[in-house]
Amino acid sequence: MNPPGSSHTPRSDDGCILFVKLGHLGADQQQREVVDTQTTQWLQGMVPGLTVMPLMRQGLGSTLVRWAPKTYFNPHKHFGGEEIFVVSGVFEDEHGRYPSGSWIRSPHMSMHKPFSVEGCTIFVKTGHLLDN
């Protein structure tokens, strides 16, 4: 995440998917943060088979979530909405099946019952889609 006024030149030797959202940092989030997801420890999630890696130390929730095969989560609502990008595998809920590369945007107070039969890793951002 790059604060206003900063710059960068992204590159990749082998190609990649670059997920970019501009202009979303609050006044209290102006410091650049870097998380090395190859070395950061995964933490136990709220149900067996779920592990999480928080990506922001403050503010809204940005998290990597790893689902082991045949992991099921409780039905729940999202205060402030939720965005999901499926990094690998297949993520599912009662609304559909979302393979790697899928993006899901669910509005404030949306509800679902997520699971993954095959296993997956997703990027999740929550709480930033409040109604104006």
Label every PLM stretch briefly.
Residues 10-11, 64-65, 74-78, 95-96, ...:
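Short histidine-centered beta-strand/loop micro-motifs
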Residues 68-71, 78-94, 100:
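Glycine- and acidic-residue-biased ligand/ion/polar-headgroup-sensing regions
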Residues 62, 81, 93, 109-111:
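A structural connector/turn signal
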Residues 13-59, 132:
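A short, N-terminal "cap"/entry segment at the start of jelly-roll beta-barrel domains
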Residues 3-28, 108-132:
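Ligand-binding loop in jelly-roll beta-barrel domains
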Residues 55, 72-75:
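Regulatory nucleotide-sensing modules
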Residues 5, 68-70, 101, 107-109:
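Tight coil/turn sites that cap or link beta-strands
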